[in-house]
Amino acid sequence: MALSPRDTTKRRAQRVRTRLRKVANGRPRLSVFRSAKNIYAQVIDDERGVTLAAASSLEGEKKDKGSDKDAAARVGALVAQRAIEKGVKDVVFDRGGYLYHGRVKALADAAREAGLNF
């Protein structure tokens, strides 16, 4: 029985998260969600089930396009700034089954430059 592309993506993302939980050692998870028009990131404490910091490309000026690498870099810097304000410096990067390329990579690089360690 063949799986649909959507089911395959969901299973891959779940597999990645399961591996991350084994490696995390209590560190929060920087989770990325990418849509066709926007990108979202949040720092999640899985032990308590709480979102510590979040940012998306919907924030800010409406005229800016939210689907390019510049928007992803802004989101990465913003979520890193908010996480550091909450006292979180070390995280585990959860790319959510997306390839580490393009917007996902731009978000991760900006978060690293803003001070998050992963």
Swiss-Prot record:
Gene3D superfamilies: 3.30.420.100. The keyword rRNA-binding applies. GO terms for biological process: translation. Pfam families: Ribosomal_L18p (PF00861). Keywords: Ribonucleoprotein, Ribosomal protein, RNA-binding, rRNA-binding. The keyword Ribonucleoprotein applies. It comes from the Bacteria. InterPro entries: Ribosomal_uL18_bac-type, Ribosomal_uL18_bac/euk. GO terms for cellular component: cytosolic large ribosomal subunit. GO terms for molecular function: 5S rRNA binding; structural constituent of ribosome. PANTHER family: 39S RIBOSOMAL PROTEIN L18, MITOCHONDRIAL, LARGE RIBOSOMAL SUBUNIT PROTEIN UL18M. Belongs to the universal ribosomal protein uL18 family. Part of the 50S ribosomal subunit; part of the 5S rRNA/L5/L18/L25 subcomplex. Contacts the 5S and 23S rRNAs. This is one of the proteins that bind and probably mediate the attachment of the 5S RNA into the large ribosomal subunit, where it forms part of the central protuberance. This is Large ribosomal subunit protein uL18. The gene is rplR.
